[in-house]
Amino acid sequence: MIRHVAVFRFVPEFTMEQREHWMSLLRALPRHIPELRSMSVGPDVLGAPTSHELAIVADFDDLDGLAAYTRHPAHAEVLKISAPVKVSLATVDFEIPDAS
């Protein structure tokens, strides 16, 4: 399995209401992108100086699934919302070994 993690910081003008709407669109992506096995989305709860404001954790069977997600039109639509309000984005993609 491949795990995709993305953490964001946003401009202050990106309101909590707008963030909640954006997160609801992200949470709907597994219904539109079959390669997306699971997705967790949530705001930071600590507010530490080094914290990002929001995180996404998404799981895929393989790298092909991750590639399908990144180029899927539904994913592109969600990115259109975050692009103008994003201050920073950091991502990491890593393999989770089989439990067997």
Question: What spans do the regions from the language model cover?
Answer:
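Short, flexible helix/strand-to-coil boundary loops that buttress conserved ligand/catalytic motifs
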Residues: 70, 79-82
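Short S/T/G/P-rich N-terminal loop/turn motif that feeds into the first structured element of a domain
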Residues: 1-53, 61-71, 94-100
